[in-house]
Amino acid sequence: PVGKYVVIRLPMIFGINAPRTLEIDTAIKKDVSIEVFPNTIINVNSDVRLSQQIHYLINHKKTGIYHLGSTDLISHFDFIRTLIERRHNKSGIYKQVYTSNTMRYLATLPKENKLPHHLQPSYTDILDDLSLR
């Protein structure tokens, strides 16, 4: 029925102790290469911010389709490189993977049903959430 549902579209989700993040941490410690996609443009979210956003949707009885990613875009390679620099204060070893000759966009950006400003993180906010310092 109309008005009784919420569809949440998610980008790549990171968490301070999420498997994806811990896999990157392990690769850094073992000096193993990390696959990155330089021509893939993404937006991201963190597990903490996602839970805040869902909490808001439930408490305010919102309905409709929501895109819960960062408000800005970054290349996958730049995001992973910055994440590693912030978490480990060093650069990693990267295996750059090109899946096509053109830029690919894997992003969930809202056109309608926007959340309040304090629940719309940028990718730098997500990087701050994942920092170990």
Where are these regions (language model features)?
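Conserved C-terminal active-site "lid" loop/helix of NAD(P)H-dependent oxidoreductases
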Residues: 75-81, 94-133
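Pocket-edge positions in alpha/beta enzyme catalytic cores
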Residues: 39-42, 71, 118
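Short glycine/proline-enriched coil/turn segments at helix->beta-strand junctions
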Residues: 1-5, 30-33, 59-63, 85, ...
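Short, amphipathic alpha-helical "lid/cap" segments that border enzyme active or binding sites
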Residues: 25, 47-55, 120-131
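Short, low-complexity, polar/charged sequence segments that are solvent-exposed and flexible
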Residues: 25-29, 53-56, 85-88, 112-115
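NAD(P)-dependent short-chain dehydrogenase/reductase
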Residues: 1-42, 49
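Mid/C-terminal beta-alpha module of Rossmann-like enzyme folds, strongest
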Residues: 53-105
